[in-house]
Amino acid sequence: MALTEAPEEFRTTFQDEVKSALRVLDNVEMLDFIGLQGGTAVDVFKHDVACTTKANLCVFIVEHPSIGLGMEIMQRYHTKRPMMIFAREGQKVTRMVTGMLEQLNQPLLRYESAADIVRLVDAFRSAFLEGVGAPE
């Protein structure tokens, strides 16, 4: 399944709300993925791998199954760089993701609203900039 098959509200309104709120944080640059906006399949692959590899922090929302998202998470896993994985409260998440998080000793972050995601990312960003590590 592709993320493009996620509910319209999630793909547009919710993602836009999260991205807009994250963009206004200090020291944050949003690396947008091409998605369906254009380019060839190879362009999308190369761009998404570059973004996933380059970013100081990747934020993944995993409540809607997506093969591409899974590939991006695994790419990020191999970089050994920080990532935050979110799922809406009460949503099931594949054991492949929960097992990876357990191995990394990292929590699956639950949220009820876009504001919850932004708050946790901002806390991580602040801790990262201060050099104290990720907040619990």
Task: Please give the residue ranges for each predicted region.
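Conserved catalytic or regulatory cores that recognize and/or transform ribose-phosphate-containing ligands
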Residues: M1-E136
